Regions:
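Glycine- and acidic-residue-biased ligand/ion/polar-headgroup-sensing regions
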Residues: 45-47, 54-83
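A short glycine-rich, His/Asp/Glu-containing loop-to-beta-strand
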Residues: 14-19, 35-56
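Short, conserved glycine- and acidic-residue-centered signature motifs
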Residues: 64, 208, 260
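C-terminal structural cap/anchor segments
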Residues: 238, 248, 257-260
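Generic hydrophobic, amphipathic alpha-helix propensity
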Residues: 211-215, 259-264
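Alpha-helical bundle regulatory/interaction domains
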Residues: 1-35, 80-223, 228-230, 234-240, ...
Length: 335
């Protein structure tokens, strides 16, 4: 069975939640402006792919599913470099995410990205069959630079699948077409990894990765209210200066700025989803530690382009799949 879905978004939270399948994704927009994004999801028999485009600079936190190996890349060369796990990555590199990690992906402008995932045992078998050696999941996230022909082939196939998913999903859903496209993508992935030059990662970089993973775990454990810096440093088990260096490296901002942006986005999420008859701006703002409501309202408008009260009153921009007959999702499933 092939699962195909395409969708457009104006709400970043709905966008990140919908990426799914490749693993939980959270995001924080770091630039002002009107957000819009598109997402294409195709799940073949073994290989799953995602293809997205988003309009504003952001930090996304990606936690891969334990049962799948994830490979991420830029879908075209003509865009700014991204920072993945604190290191600037060029558009012609592929990131192979380690199982059980939590990686930060930071962009400075609009981004066009692709991802493919495979069960580790399938990737190993494909490597053995196509290249004569098994391809095993890395113990830590690493970055490789494939040959020019290999990355161009991967991008071309990924784009072709994305085009069919949008313009002719009924054709892509045919078993013979889906099988051919899946096999071609799997071969392209193996050739990318087999032809690649590894990019060195230092031991200090891996230590910072562990600190950032503990940071995200601590934030998730306290996701329903404010988190104070002294408590956070204690939970992470490091000093503020070390945490500051890690956040600057991975997020491009201080931990205080990151916490503030995170609280603002959580407040926005709750405002956009709350029932205005049962909730108030004051209740939601104070639940995230914003006690000075006037300053909160000004900061909210500056960051999101509308007042908190407007966000509370208007209906959600991006209803979830199945909520109504006008769902923006387009689904196709083959037999």
């Amino acid at each position: 069975m092939t699962y195909i879905a395409t969708r457009s978004f104006t709400d970043p939270d709905s966008y990140y939640e919908s990426i799914g399948g490749v693993g939980p994704v959270e995001g924080i927009i770091t630039a002002r402006g009107n957000f819009h994004a598109t997402l294409t999801c195709v799940n073949f028999s073994r290989l799953w792919m995602r293809r997205g485009e988003d309009s504003l600079a952001r930090v996304a936190i990606y936690t891969p599913r334990m049962a799948r190996t994830t490979m991420m890349f830029a879908t075209d060369q003509d865009q700014p470099a991204r920072h993945i796990a604190g290191v600037e990555r060029q558009p012609d590199e592929v990131t192979v995410v380690s199982l059980g990690s939590s990686e930060h992906v930071r962009t400075s402008a609009a981004a066009r990205w692709g991802a493919v995932t495979l069960p580790p045992e399938d990737l190993a078998a494909l490597g053995q069959a196509i290249n004569g050696r098994e391809l095993t999941p890395p113990s830590f996230t690493h970055h490789v630079k494939p040959s020019k022909s290999a990355i161009l082939r991967l991008r071309s196939l990924h784009e072709a699948v994305g085009h069919l998913a949008k313009k002719a999903p009924d054709i892509l859903a045919r078993s013979e077409v889906a099988r051919a496209m899946e096999e071609a993508l799997q071969e392209a992935i193996v050739f990318c990894l087999a032809s690649a030059e590894p990019v060195h990662v230092s031991s200090a970089h891996r230590h910072h990765a562990r600190i950032m993973r503990r940071l995200e775990e601590a934030l998730h454990a306290n996701s329903n209210g404010p988190v104070y810096m002294s408590e956070l440093c204690a939970a992470v088990g490091t000093s503020y200066s070390t945490l500051r260096d890690c956040c600057q490296e991975r997020l491009g901002m201080s931990p205080k700025r990151y916490l503030w942006l995170r609280r603002m986005h959580l407040a926005r999420r709750d405002l956009c989803r709350a029932d205005p008859e049962k909730s108030s701006v004051t209740e939601i703002a104070t639940s995230y530690g914003f006690w000075e409501l006037g300053r909160f309202a000004v900061a909210y408008r500056t960051l999101f382009g509308e007042s908190p009260s407007m966000a509370l009153r208007r209906p959600p921009d991006d209803p979830k799949p199945g909520e109504n007959a006008e769902s923006p999702w387009q689904f196709i499933k083959s037999a």
